[in-house]
């Protein structure tokens, strides 16, 4: 009787875990890296027949990239060649991934694995200006929420959306490595740091006007120097031998 009860309990736990595991899998598929699906689903704008090919100039760049690796290791170039495809096209449809696999002579799955792992690869179309707002702890403590709210209000979109004119895409990201200059955002390849809501509004206005705002801190400080100014290293360092006894 004890054995029957134990088996029944084990069966119930197994069924419960099975349901939980299925839900975890569903969540992971829905909320993969960058909020995108880990798996590919054909759409009218993203399928194996979506036109994509590298330009002649980029084919030359690919060969230059491949030469950085030992002979027979073309697969090592998957990351930079995917980046090249994204810079040419703005995002990575499945056809671009297939082209990368073809050019590097690797199975397509090897390219898919990389493209779905790294959040920097855009697997759906983005606007001309891809705005990535860091909301990890240091930025959050420096009020990154106000930056995100200002952007949503100014652009009229929510996180994960693109403006109707295809000019701006807004996403929320994890740490971008500029914690000392929090709060900050990355727009395309540029970092804008030490932001206030007024700063980010001005940046958007400049981009809309076709200008390129100056990257870096908006607070006036240089790079990541102390906010109150330098307290050490206030003059050029002395040369070799400084302070050494003359007799040595």
UniProtKB/Swiss-Prot annotation:
Query: Which cysteine residues pair off into disulfide bonds?
Result: none
Can you say where in the cell this protein is located?
Mitochondrion inner membrane
Which key words tag this protein in UniProt?
A: 2Fe-2S, Electron transport, Iron, Iron-sulfur, Membrane, Metal-binding, Mitochondrion, Mitochondrion inner membrane, NAD, Oxidoreductase, Phosphoprotein, Respiratory chain, Transit peptide, Translocase, Transport, Ubiquinone
User: Where does it mainly reside?
Assistant: mitochondrion
Q: How does it assemble?
A: Core subunit of respiratory chain NADH dehydrogenase (Complex I) which is composed of 45 different subunits. This is a component of the flavoprotein-sulfur (FP) fragment of the enzyme.
- Family matches, as PANTHER family: NADH DEHYDROGENASE [UBIQUINONE] FLAVOPROTEIN 2, MITOCHONDRIAL, NADH DEHYDROGENASE UBIQUINONE FLAVOPROTEIN 2, MITOCHONDRIAL
One Gene Ontology cellular component term attached to this UniProt record is:
mitochondrion
The membrane topology of this protein is:
Peripheral membrane protein
The catalysed reaction is: a ubiquinone + NADH + 5 H(+)(in) = a ubiquinol + NAD(+) + 4 H(+)(out)
Q: What are the names of the required cofactors?
A: [2Fe-2S] cluster
Enzyme Commission number, as recorded: 7.1.1.2
**Protein name (database record):** NADH dehydrogenase [ubiquinone] flavoprotein 2, mitochondrial
**InterPro entries in the record:** NuoE-like, NuoE_dom, NuoE_N, Thioredoxin-like_sf
Query: A Gene Ontology molecular-function term?
Result: NADH dehydrogenase (ubiquinone) activity
Chain sites annotated for binding [2Fe-2S] cluster: 134, 139, 175, 179
Q: Where is this region: Disordered?
A: 229-248
Cofactor note (record): Binds 1 [2Fe-2S] cluster.
- In chain numbering, the transit peptide falls at 1-31
- Residue(s) carrying Phosphotyrosine: 192
Sum up the protein's function in the record's words.
Core subunit of the mitochondrial membrane respiratory chain NADH dehydrogenase (Complex I) which catalyzes electron transfer from NADH through the respiratory chain, using ubiquinone as an electron acceptor. Parts of the peripheral arm of the enzyme, where the electrons from NADH are accepted by flavin mononucleotide (FMN) and then passed along a chain of iron-sulfur clusters by electron tunnelling to the final acceptor ubiquinone. Contains one iron-sulfur cluster.
Which Pfam families does UniProt cross-reference here? Answer: 2Fe-2S_thioredx
């Amino acid at each position: 009787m004890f054995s029957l009860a134990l088996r029944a309990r084990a069966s119930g736990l197994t069924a419960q875990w099975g349901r939980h595991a299925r839900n975890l899998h569903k969540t992971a598929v829905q909320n993969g890296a960058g909020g995108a699906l880990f798996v590919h689903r054909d759409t009218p704008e993203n399928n194996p027949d979506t036109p994509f090919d590298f330009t002649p100039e980029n084919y030359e760049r690919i060969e230059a990239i491949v030469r950085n690796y030992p002979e027979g290791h073309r697969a090592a170039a998957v990351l930079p060649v995917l980046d090249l495809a994204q810079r040419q096209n703005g995002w990575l449809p499945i056809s671009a991934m297939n082209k990368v696999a073809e050019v590097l002579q690797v199975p397509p799955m090897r390219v898919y694995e990389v493209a779905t792992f790294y959040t920097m690869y855009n697997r759906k179309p983005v606007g001309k200006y891809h705005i990535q707002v860091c909301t990890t702890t240091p930025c959050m403590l420096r009020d990154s929420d106000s930056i995100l709210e200002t952007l949503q209000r100014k652009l009229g979109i929510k996180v994960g959306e693109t403006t109707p004119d295809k000019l701006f895409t807004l996403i929320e990201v994890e740490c971008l490595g500029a914690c000392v200059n929090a709060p900050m955002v990355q727009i395309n390849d540029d970092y804008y740091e030490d932001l206030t809501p007024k700063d980010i509004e001005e940046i958007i206005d400049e981009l809309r006007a076709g200008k390129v705002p100056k990257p870096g801190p908006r607070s006036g400080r240089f790079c990541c120097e102390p906010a109150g100014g330098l307290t050490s290293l206030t003059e050029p360092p002395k040369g070799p031998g400084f302070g050494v006894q003359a007799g040595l």
